[in-house]
């Protein structure tokens, strides 16, 4: 890379930094949340039905919901882990205000024995896009 081009790139980076352009790019990063839940064993089947309905609706009708995955710990089927990815913070906020999410919360509130929500900062996100 020649010195003239390097100088131009440096100027562009400096301008973006001073104008807040870099911060704006960071705010458009996907939002990734992880949730760890323990479900009452006696209510596990009902919980699975409720979460399946909620997750299906979320990915079907919310454009900002990029992915939601639920898995159980091997050997501990009532200990669930959720990996959720949203286009941005606004998409996450919209999801939490959706009718199907509020219904899920109301239906499952007494089924969940414990809940831990983990906010993350994406380091590297890779997938196979079609």
Task: Go through the PLM ranges and name each one.
Residues 26-27, 53-67, 85-119:
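An amphipathic, aromatic/His-enriched active-site/gating alpha helix that lines ligand/cofactor pockets
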């Amino acid at each position: 890379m020649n010195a003239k081009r390097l100088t131009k790139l440096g100027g562009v980076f400096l301008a973006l930094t001073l104008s807040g352009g870099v911060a704006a790019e960071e705010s458009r990063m996907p939002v990734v949340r992880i949730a760890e839940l323990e479900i009452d064993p006696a209510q596990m089947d009902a919980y699975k039905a409720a979460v399946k309905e909620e997750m299906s609706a979320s990915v079907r009708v919310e454009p900002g919901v990029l992915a939601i995955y639920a898995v159980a710990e091997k050997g501990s089927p009532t200990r669930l882990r959720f990996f959720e990815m949203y286009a941005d913070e606004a998409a996450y906020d919209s999801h939490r205000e959706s009718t199907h999410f509020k219904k899920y919360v109301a239906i499952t509130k007494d089924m969940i024995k414990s809940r831990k929500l983990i906010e993350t900062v994406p380091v590297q996100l890779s997938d196979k896009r079609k």
